[in-house]
Design a protein with these regions (language model features):
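Sec-dependent signal peptide recognition
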Residues: 2-10
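C-terminal motif of bacterial Sec signal peptides marking the signal peptidase cleavage site
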Residues: 14-16
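Recognizes extended acidic, P/S/T-rich segments that occur
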Residues: 72-111
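Beta-strand-rich modules
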Residues: 106-126
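Short coil/turn motifs at secondary-structure junctions
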Residues: 67, 80, 123-125
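Bacterial signal peptide processing site
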Residues: 18-20
Protein backbone atom coordinates (compact mmCIF):
# COMPACT_ATOMS: atom_id res chain seq x y z
CA UNK A 1 0.00 0.00 0.00
CA UNK A 2 2.86 2.37 0.85
CA UNK A 3 4.44 1.80 -2.56
CA UNK A 4 1.11 2.51 -4.28
CA UNK A 5 0.74 5.80 -2.41
CA UNK A 6 4.28 6.82 -3.39
CA UNK A 7 3.56 6.05 -7.06
CA UNK A 8 0.29 7.97 -6.90
CA UNK A 9 2.08 10.99 -5.41
CA UNK A 10 4.74 10.93 -8.14
CA UNK A 11 2.04 10.70 -10.83
CA UNK A 12 0.23 13.69 -9.37
CA UNK A 13 3.41 15.75 -9.22
CA UNK A 14 4.23 15.13 -12.87
CA UNK A 15 0.74 15.72 -14.25
CA UNK A 16 0.25 18.62 -16.62
CA UNK A 17 -2.49 20.10 -14.46
CA UNK A 18 -1.94 22.16 -11.37
CA UNK A 19 -4.11 23.16 -8.46
CA UNK A 20 -3.66 26.75 -7.31
CA UNK A 21 -4.87 27.70 -3.86
CA UNK A 22 -4.94 31.45 -4.37
CA UNK A 23 -6.00 33.76 -7.15
CA UNK A 24 -3.56 36.64 -7.31
CA UNK A 25 -4.89 39.62 -9.18
CA UNK A 26 -2.03 41.51 -10.83
CA UNK A 27 -1.53 45.05 -9.62
CA UNK A 28 -2.49 47.70 -12.14
CA UNK A 29 -0.47 50.88 -12.14
CA UNK A 30 -2.96 53.76 -12.44
CA UNK A 31 -0.37 56.21 -13.75
CA UNK A 32 0.82 53.92 -16.56
CA UNK A 33 4.42 53.39 -15.48
CA UNK A 34 6.25 50.24 -16.56
CA UNK A 35 4.92 47.76 -14.04
CA UNK A 36 5.44 44.10 -14.80
CA UNK A 37 2.68 41.50 -14.67
CA UNK A 38 5.06 39.12 -12.85
CA UNK A 39 8.73 39.15 -11.86
CA UNK A 40 11.11 36.91 -9.94
CA UNK A 41 14.79 36.05 -10.28
CA UNK A 42 14.17 33.64 -13.19
CA UNK A 43 11.35 35.23 -15.17
CA UNK A 44 9.87 38.65 -15.85
CA UNK A 45 6.53 38.71 -17.68
CA UNK A 46 6.12 42.19 -19.07
CA UNK A 47 2.52 41.71 -20.16
CA UNK A 48 -0.13 39.07 -20.71
CA UNK A 49 -3.38 39.81 -22.49
CA UNK A 50 -6.31 37.65 -23.55
CA UNK A 51 -8.77 38.63 -26.27
CA UNK A 52 -11.41 36.98 -28.45
CA UNK A 53 -9.86 35.45 -31.56
CA UNK A 54 -13.06 34.39 -33.34
CA UNK A 55 -16.57 33.42 -32.31
CA UNK A 56 -15.33 30.85 -29.79
CA UNK A 57 -11.54 31.10 -29.40
CA UNK A 58 -9.31 33.08 -27.07
CA UNK A 59 -5.98 34.59 -28.14
CA UNK A 60 -3.38 34.95 -25.39
CA UNK A 61 -0.42 37.25 -26.05
CA UNK A 62 2.39 37.47 -23.51
CA UNK A 63 5.91 38.84 -23.50
CA UNK A 64 8.92 38.29 -21.27
CA UNK A 65 11.75 40.69 -20.48
CA UNK A 66 14.10 37.94 -19.35
CA UNK A 67 14.18 34.16 -18.97
CA UNK A 68 16.99 32.71 -16.81
CA UNK A 69 17.74 29.01 -16.26
CA UNK A 70 14.31 28.07 -17.65
CA UNK A 71 13.87 24.89 -19.69
CA UNK A 72 10.13 25.07 -20.30
CA UNK A 73 7.30 27.64 -20.30
CA UNK A 74 3.73 26.34 -20.18
CA UNK A 75 0.59 28.39 -20.70
CA UNK A 76 -2.10 26.96 -18.46
CA UNK A 77 -5.85 27.42 -18.75
CA UNK A 78 -8.89 26.61 -16.65
CA UNK A 79 -12.49 27.36 -15.82
CA UNK A 80 -11.47 28.27 -12.26
CA UNK A 81 -8.31 29.94 -10.95
CA UNK A 82 -7.67 26.93 -8.72
CA UNK A 83 -7.39 24.17 -11.34
CA UNK A 84 -5.43 24.86 -14.52
CA UNK A 85 -4.09 22.56 -17.26
CA UNK A 86 -1.31 23.13 -19.79
CA UNK A 87 -2.57 24.13 -23.25
CA UNK A 88 0.78 25.15 -24.78
CA UNK A 89 4.45 24.38 -24.10
CA UNK A 90 7.59 26.23 -25.20
CA UNK A 91 10.86 24.35 -24.69
CA UNK A 92 13.72 26.79 -24.09
CA UNK A 93 17.40 26.08 -24.57
CA UNK A 94 19.10 29.36 -23.66
CA UNK A 95 18.74 32.34 -21.37
CA UNK A 96 17.17 35.47 -22.81
CA UNK A 97 17.69 39.07 -21.76
CA UNK A 98 15.65 40.66 -24.53
CA UNK A 99 11.92 41.14 -24.96
CA UNK A 100 10.35 37.95 -26.36
CA UNK A 101 6.74 37.72 -27.49
CA UNK A 102 4.52 34.64 -27.53
CA UNK A 103 1.03 34.10 -28.92
CA UNK A 104 -1.26 31.15 -28.21
CA UNK A 105 -4.81 30.54 -29.39
CA UNK A 106 -7.12 28.40 -27.31
CA UNK A 107 -9.58 27.32 -30.01
CA UNK A 108 -12.23 25.85 -27.72
CA UNK A 109 -12.20 27.34 -24.23
CA UNK A 110 -14.36 25.45 -21.75
CA UNK A 111 -16.28 28.46 -20.39
CA UNK A 112 -17.04 32.12 -21.05
CA UNK A 113 -14.84 33.06 -18.08
CA UNK A 114 -11.35 31.58 -18.32
CA UNK A 115 -8.21 31.85 -16.21
CA UNK A 116 -4.66 31.78 -17.59
CA UNK A 117 -1.27 31.40 -15.94
CA UNK A 118 2.31 30.67 -16.99
CA UNK A 119 4.15 27.81 -15.30
CA UNK A 120 7.90 27.48 -15.82
CA UNK A 121 10.41 24.70 -15.19
CA UNK A 122 14.01 25.40 -14.21
CA UNK A 123 17.19 23.51 -15.14
CA UNK A 124 17.59 22.34 -11.53
CA UNK A 125 14.13 20.71 -11.55
CA UNK A 126 12.31 23.43 -9.61
CA UNK A 127 9.32 25.24 -11.08
CA UNK A 128 7.34 28.41 -10.56
CA UNK A 129 4.08 30.10 -11.45
CA UNK A 130 3.05 33.59 -12.49
CA UNK A 131 -0.02 35.45 -11.33
CA UNK A 132 -3.37 34.37 -12.78
CA UNK A 133 -5.10 36.34 -15.53
CA UNK A 134 -8.92 36.31 -15.68
CA UNK A 135 -10.61 36.66 -19.08
CA UNK A 136 -14.36 37.19 -19.51
CA UNK A 137 -15.69 36.67 -23.04
CA UNK A 138 -17.53 39.71 -24.35
CA UNK A 139 -15.53 42.25 -22.31
Amino acid sequence: MKKFLQLALVAILFASCSKQNDLIEPAIDPVGANQLFFQDINLAVYSIKASSSNSTGVKIDFSTLYEKNITKLELMSGETPNYLCAIHTENLSANSTQLKSYQVIEANPKASTMYYMIRYSLKNGDWGYTNVLKFQRGN
